[in-house]
Amino acid sequence: MATYKDSGVDIDAGDRAVELMKASIAKASRPEVMGGIGGFAGLFDASALKSMKQPLLATSTDGVGTKTEIARQMGKYDTIGEDLVAMVVDDLVVCGAEPLFMTDYIAVGKVVPEHIADIVAGIARGCSKANTALIGGETAEHPGLLDDDEFDVAG
């Protein structure tokens, strides 16, 4: 039976990345967030919306395109996350929606915990500025599909 390790996925590096990002994520919260890091889904107490006349939920997904290549070439990963949040939040506010929460998806060729933590720190910083909770995410290691230093982010 093949294992993650046999396929080139480093679970230990992923676990280290989670430990490194916990402090950043804690800063990107709202009182309505239920639960913590590591669950299969982020939970948000929607009863906070009951005071609204006609509460509607809006959602948006976006990425940062080729800016990931600029971040990679510069070796600077903490600003790309903030840019990601700006793209998602902008798409929501133009509809008149309040961005309540978001999740992230980070795909990498090889997990470098410090790089992942820097990306998430930027996402958390952007979320804090927008009063938006970061309630979940996924870091996916794709050896063979992406080069070791390649990555993409979406939220």
Feature-to-residue mapping (PLM):
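N-terminal amphipathic/basic leader segments beginning at the initiator methionine
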Residues: M1-M34
